[in-house]
């Protein structure tokens, strides 16, 4: 008996649990629709200890500024996995939060650092109509997830990417190839790429500390 070619088809459902920090700005109880940011942390903050998320990025900013004017969700990636395989769960989380809180669906923003930068590129490319703007920091795409080609899905989504030129953990080229691919797609949305010539991997502290980032977010709104 020779080997025979066969096809097996099945549908598998799974349950995914994500712990997250949720920031609600003062006055949110008035019901006015607020802008929303989904923040994705880096690899070092994975696990089941939410305090790890407070070490870097937006949760750190919010801890020092409780009046931060955006609604912000900062989920924690479970140990031994990555954001890029959790994109459907992240989309479901955003949908749930939009339904439960006074969030403006036309002002949903996405950002992440390092592994969260990879997750931002991947999530936004998977659901290109979801976010009004995307800010990946020191991330990339990964050929095994179909990048850089997949990033063309974001040609009509405003993107502002950041990277340190001296980054030895995630090379600058990881972001550069995605930005170049976006430019070649000739989309309708603005593309910005900030390179910090003297910074290594931590290009997020200076970025999240800059008020211009949040002003730029607010200038982006889905029509």
Language model: regions and residue ranges:
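A domain-start/cap signature at the N-terminus of enzymes
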Residues: 1-36, 70, 111-113, 118, ...
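Gly/Ser-rich "nucleophile elbow"/oxyanion-hole loop immediately N-terminal to the catalytic nucleophile
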Residues: 26-32, 78-115, 128-130
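Short, solvent-exposed loop/turn and secondary-structure capping segments
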Residues: 32-33, 48-52, 84-87, 123, ...
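Active-site machinery of serine-nucleophile hydrolases
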Residues: 34-36, 40-91
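Solvent-exposed loop/turn segments at secondary-structure junctions
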Residues: 42-46, 78-82, 114-118, 140-143, ...
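Short helix-capping segments at alpha-helix termini
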Residues: 65-67, 100-102, 129-130, 183-188
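Primarily recognizes the serine-hydrolase "nucleophile elbow" in alpha/beta-hydrolase
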Residues: 99-100, 106-153
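The feature captures the conserved acid-bearing segment of alpha/beta-hydrolase catalytic domains
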Residues: 132-215
